Each structure stands twice: as C-alpha cells, then as structure tokens.
Amino acid sequence: MKTTEILIHQLMVMEGRSLEAYKDAAGVPTIGYGHTKGVRMGDRISERWAVELLKMDVQDVELQVKALDVARTEGQLDALVSFAFNLGITRLRDSDLLKLIRKGASKNAITQEFKRWVYAGGKKLRGLETRREWEAKRFFE
C-alpha cells in the first residue's frame, strides 16, 4: 500500500507553494510545498524541484507512518501521512490520536481528535482546521 495522488494533490493545495524561502506560521524556514529540511532564508527553487521535494518528503514520511503499523487502507495512510507531514512523526507517534486508532475507537472519537490539532505558534488557524477536516474524512474513506 502506498500514499495516493489524492494526497499529493491535497498537500499541494493545503501547503501552498512558494519558490522562495519564507517562515511558516511556526517560524520555520520553508520552501516549495512545505519543505523545511535544510532551508535557509533567501533560498529559491524551481517549480519542478518543488514538486520533486514534495514527493521525496512524502515518501520519507510514508515510511515512518508505515512503521507505526496502524494504517489499514489507502485513506488511512494518506490521512496519517498528511498529519505527520504537517506536525512531524514524533507528534503522531506520541499522540492520543494514535492511541485511539490503535484501540479501535469510534469514528466520532477519532474525528474529534484530528480536529484538536489546529494550532501553530499558539494560534488557532483556519487552514489547519480545514486540513484536519480533510484528514478525518480521508481516514474513513
């Protein structure tokens, strides 16, 4: 099982694209479609490289999520990769969300837990609310 083009497209929409480095809502230097590793302010990239970085980043996160051994469908894998792509694998691994999934909690409980993760830099962000809604929906597809 692999992440889908649905996820790639959704990440492109959710992350937005910048061909020039900028600081994200949490103050982290970011470029392309949410790429942060090794980014310095002033960096610039091409659209083609932005897409390649996204695909490589998704592949890395996918391997980490698969190691948790909880995703049973493509929808679950897409949702959890999106979550970990945004927040980091450590936050997913240590989260109540993962605990709920592992114990087979109800759709409502899992959906509500996704929706708790909507803050960056101490601020509630509409973009994160939209993202968590998509992840919760995709998880159950």
What are these regions (language model features)?
Residues 74-96:
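Mid-chain, well-packed structural core segment of small domains
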